[in-house]
Amino acid sequence: MSRKTYEKIANINGMFNMLEQQIIHSQDMAHFRSEFFYVNHEHRENYEALLIYYKNSIDNPIVDGACYILALPEIFNSVDVFESELPFSWVYDENGITETMKSLSIPLQYLVAAALEVTDVNIFKPSGFTMGMNNWNIAQMRIFWQYTAIIRKEAL
C-alpha cells in the first residue's frame, strides 16, 4: 500500500473516530453541534435557524439530520424553507420530483435522496445512496458522514 493510500485511510479512520465521539457526547448539544462538519459559516447559521424553526428536531434525529442537509447554502438559498411543513417536503409532490429539487447540483440531489431513503422514501433508481457513493467528492462524503452521525446520535 502506498503512503498516500495509507494516509487517506488514516484520515478516514480519524473522521470516523471523531464522528463516534460526537455520538458519545451528543447529550451536550452545544458541544455536539460545534464539532460538526460545516461547508462554511453560512451552513452552520442556516442549520441553527432551522433547528429553531423545526422544533421537533430536538426529539427527532431524522428531522435534525434533514435540517443539517437543508442548511447547505446551495439548498437553503434555493428553497423557501420556512414554507415547508417538514424539511424535505419541497423535494416531491403529486407530480413527482419538483423543479426545485431538479435545479440542485446532481451530487446534492443524491445527498437529499440518500437522506430521504432513511425513511423509506425512494425517489431515484439506483438509489441516491448508491449514486452518491459513486460520485460524491470528499466534502460531500463528509456531509453524508456527518448526517449519519446526527441521525444515529442515540445509538450509544
UniProtKB/Swiss-Prot annotation:
InterPro entries: DUF2538 (IPR024469)
Domain of life: Bacteria
Annotated protein name in UniProt: Uncharacterized protein SAOUHSC_00996
Record organism: Staphylococcus aureus (strain NCTC 8325 / PS 47)
